[in-house]
């Protein structure tokens, strides 16, 4: 395998610096998506149906161009299976003309999405309870199909071994395997575990120029897609570790699931870009292939407008997925801790935040005989040898700014000052900060202390740096009089300064850390700016220092100049990593309850989540060590062993979502287009607050009481549930009736929740409470989030 990787690296390395052989040649033309709702040809289209749909797209665009042939040349994707629309290279004026067509729901630019980049399953409790565990009850996700839309897959990873697997489930309608074999390999790239792999790059090439044909493959050259897919559905692999830490058995949440890879994210430099037209094509194909769960570990890096729920590719794709009984799970984003930054917020998307687990990759720093614990994957220095510390700002080149040197940006450090020392740099990125180490190494440093900024809080990341590095919590800068050179940073009583002596211990793995989970400071936060009545994120899952399978082609650090290749596993962080944890859990529930809807699976995971850590105290926020709230973790931290048998669920149908869109003020013609072009009449009696969501959010309360309705479906044995509430500060909550009795599975009961703000409630400030139904065995919890106008 090693020689094959080396050969592949030699073959492709020249292209990695000169990949885009042809520039984009379309002048002012850009890639637009023309969205037209759903097809009327039904869930199992024939080849004639597909041809007819594509012809209708040619006809529509041809009416604008005055030429059907020109329309064929302009269209790069015809979404002809389940999503109705096409992607085409258009002038702005042409896009505006198409938008006037009454059959068109929306026309929008194909957006650039960014990636939201072992022990975790033990931390989630899957190993503890034998026959009562979610793994046992969910048969390890057996024959559930998880589709991953990402950077592709490294098929040779043992995480995708099909040893012991039977025939591929008959529900699978895919089978295409667009992965080139490694040089000299006779092994099939897809098998009974990895049952399909496709790639989509037309929109990427439209924006950036054509890729070399050697790169036209679903093979993962980045590592992100392999990591996320193995986290969701990877097989058991003993002896998984990276840089001699984290030794254990790697596995996914649904280790016996079948998996499929859809490559839409492309990059020769980190991070990869995923263009919306490619994403939509992949989702349309995944629906048609017959997946049960779709994992999407990326999103836009900005908040779209309130009108944009149907100008966002992931939102559109997820809507069509749920209409075919497929759950789409997406990452919340890495733009925290700023409020209102959460991505992927449509109510039909399952949105996942990131938090820590109880394992650390740790290294001790001894600074002037004071011990400081930090995070590290790799320290290759003699543990008893002391090195001199230099602050990066004291080693800056004359032409470098103070800020650039503080962040150890490229070309800022003076080699004559840094050589042979430990350099202290300030961490710039919220997720990945490997470039700082490259600058320090280039300048001759022996190691680096990477000090968090306040925005990073106390989320410590063990990253695959290019040399010995330890990440430490933020240390306040010591003020200096004007004109005095800054030579120290740190706590006022004990600042670090140039000339201090430093020792670094070897990196080691520590288990049973407390408290855990803690909300990652980078995890994007609510409130939901697009649909304020829907709490987002939905839940949190492990997303810090996650060890999983990796592309053996990619460098450990993802830096092109990093020649360390051949890693079977790597440690990454981000909501990209927490997202597939939820997808893996969803796979278990789908195997256990194959008839459940996506909303029921989502409800089960949400209503059984916890807001307590492993010390039985409220979950903290790593940003400032205060208590986290529902805008950080949604309903709480996932608990798969409880989600597998939740007692009650809040179910939703396509009609419920259409009524929600009616109440949200969307055009009735648009709603009919989403309803497979069948007329849908908005009754006018629905409120956005009445969507049967497992959480309750009321963002515009006055002093007058507000009544909302919820319906629960019994999925457990006959029992009587009683309600309890924890009212938000300044508000009262009443539930009618206070008890619900169920005599059979599938029985539905409706209750009302009356919420009233008092004059003591603070205006324009969110407060938090919850509602719980319990029968003595199950606890079905819904967070309540309220704000007085």
From Swiss-Prot:
PANTHER family, A to Z: PROPROTEIN CONVERTASE SUBTILISIN/KEXIN
Entry protein name: Subtilisin-like protease Glyma18g48580
Main location: secreted
Region Disordered, residue ranges: 468-499
Database matches in Pfam families: fn3_6, Inhibitor_I9, PA, Peptidase_S8
Organs and tissues of expression: Expressed in roots, stems, flowers and young leaves. Barely detectable in matures leaves.
InterPro entries xref list: PA_domain, Peptidase_S8/S53_dom, Peptidase_S8/S53_dom_sf, Peptidase_S8_Ser-AS, Peptidase_S8_subtilisin-rel, Peptidases_S8_3, S8pro/Inhibitor_I9, S8pro/Inhibitor_I9_sf
GO molecular function, one term: serine-type endopeptidase activity
Domain PA: 401-489
Subcellular locations according to the entry: Secreted
Keyword check for Signal: yes
Peptidase S8 domain boundaries: 120-644
Organism expressing this protein natively: Glycine max
Induction: Not induced by wounding, methyl jasmonate, methyl salicylate or etephon.
Positions annotated as active site in the UniProt record: 150 (charge relay system), 224 (charge relay system), 576 (charge relay system)
């Amino acid at each position: 395998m090693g020689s094959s990787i080396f050969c592949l690296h030699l073959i492709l390395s020249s292209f990695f610096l000169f990949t885009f052989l042809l520039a984009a040649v379309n002048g002012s033309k850009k890639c637009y998506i023309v969205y037209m709702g759903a097809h009327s040809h039904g869930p199992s289209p024939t080849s004639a149906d597909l041809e007819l749909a594509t012809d209708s797209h040619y006809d529509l665009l041809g009416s604008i161009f005055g030429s059907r042939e020109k329309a064929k040349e302009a269209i790069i994707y015809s979404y002809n299976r389940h999503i109705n629309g096409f992607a085409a290279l258009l002038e702005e004026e042409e896009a505006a003309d198409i938008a006037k067509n009454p059959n068109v729901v929306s026309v929008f630019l194909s957006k650039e999405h960014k990636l939201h980049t072992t022990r975790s399953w033990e931390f989630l409790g899957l190993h503890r309870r034998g026959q009562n565990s979610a793994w046992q009850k969910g048969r390890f996700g057996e024959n559930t199909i998880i589709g991953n839309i990402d950077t592709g897959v490294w098929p040779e990873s043992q995480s995708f071994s099909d040893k012991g697997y039977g025939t591929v489930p008959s529900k699978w309608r895919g089978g295409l395997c667009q992965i080139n074999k490694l040089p000299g390999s006779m092994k099939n790239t897809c098998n009974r575990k990895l049952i399909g792999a496709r790639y989509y790059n037309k929109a990427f090439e439209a924006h950036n120029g054509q890729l070399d044909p050697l790169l036209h493959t679903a093979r993962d050259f980045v590592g992100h897609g392999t990591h996320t897919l193995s986290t969701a559905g990877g097989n058991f692999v003993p002896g998984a570790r990276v840089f001699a830490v984290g030794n254990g058995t790697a596995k996914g949440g649904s280790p016996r699931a079948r998996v499929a890879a859809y490559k839409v994210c492309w990059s020769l430099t980190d991070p990869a870009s995923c263009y919306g037209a490619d994403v939509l094509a992949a989702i349309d194909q995944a629906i048609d292939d017959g997946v049960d769960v779709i994992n999407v570990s990326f999103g836009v890096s900005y908040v779209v407008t309130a009108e944009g729920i149907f100008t966002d590719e992931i939102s559109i794709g997820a809507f069509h997925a749920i209409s075919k009984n497929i759950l789409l799970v997406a990452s919340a984003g890495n733009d925290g801790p700023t409020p209102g930054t959460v991505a992927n917020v449509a109510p039909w998307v399952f949105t996942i935040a990131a938090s820590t687990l109880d394992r650390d990759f740790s290294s001790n720093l001894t600074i002037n005989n004071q011990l400081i614990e930090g995070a590290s994957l790799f320290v290759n220095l003699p543990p008893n040898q002391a090195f001199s510390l230099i602050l990066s700002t004291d080693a800056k080149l004359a032409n470098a700014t103070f800020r650039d040197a503080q962040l150890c940006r490229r070309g800022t450090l003076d080699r004559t000052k840094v050589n042979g020392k430990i350099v202290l740099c300030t961490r710039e990125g919220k997720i990945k900060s490997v470039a700082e180490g490259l600058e320090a190494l280039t300048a001759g440093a022996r190691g680096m202390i990477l000090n968090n900024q306040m925005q990073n809080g106390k989320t410590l990341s063990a990253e695959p740096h290019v040399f010995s590095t330890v990440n430490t919590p933020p240390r306040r800068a010591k003020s200096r009089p004007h004109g005095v050179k800054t030579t120290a940073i740190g706590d006022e009583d004990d600042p670090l300064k140039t000339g201090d002596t430093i020792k670094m211990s070897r990196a080691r793995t520590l288990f049973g850390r407390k408290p855990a989970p803690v909300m990652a400071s980078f995890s994007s936060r609510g409130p939901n700016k697009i649909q304020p009545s829907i709490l987002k994120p939905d839940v949190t899952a492990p997303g810090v220092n996650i060890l999983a399978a990796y592309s053996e082609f990619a460098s450990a650090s993802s830096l092109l100049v990093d020649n360390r290749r051949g890693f079977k596993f790597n440690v990454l962080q981000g909501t990209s990593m927490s997202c597939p944890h939820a997808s893996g859990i969803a796979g278990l529930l789908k195997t256990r309850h194959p008839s459940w809807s996506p909303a029921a699976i989502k409800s089960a995971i949400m209503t059984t989540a916890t807001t307590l850590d492993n010390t039985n105290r409220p979950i903290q926020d790593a940003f400032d060590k205060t208590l986290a709230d529902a805008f950080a973790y949604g309903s709480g931290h996932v608990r798969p062993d409880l989600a597998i048998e939740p007692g009650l669920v809040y179910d939703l149908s396509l009609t419920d979502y259409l009524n929600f869109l009616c109440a949200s003020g969307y055009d009735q013609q648009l709603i009919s287009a989403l309803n497979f072009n069948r007329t849908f009449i908005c009754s006018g009696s629905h409120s956005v607050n009445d969507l049967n969501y497992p959480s309750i959010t009321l963002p515009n309360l006055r002093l007058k009481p507000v009544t909302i309705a919820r319906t629960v479906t019994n999925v457990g044995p006959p029992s009587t549930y009683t309600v309890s509430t924890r009212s938000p500060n300044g508000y009262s909550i009443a539930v009618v009736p206070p008890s619900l009795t169920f005599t059979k599975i599938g029985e539905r009961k409706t209750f009302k929740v009356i919420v009233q703000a008092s004059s003591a409630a603070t205006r324009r400030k969110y407060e938090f409470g919850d509602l719980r139904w319990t029968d003595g065995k199950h606890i079905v919890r819904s967070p309540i989030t309220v704000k007085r106008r």
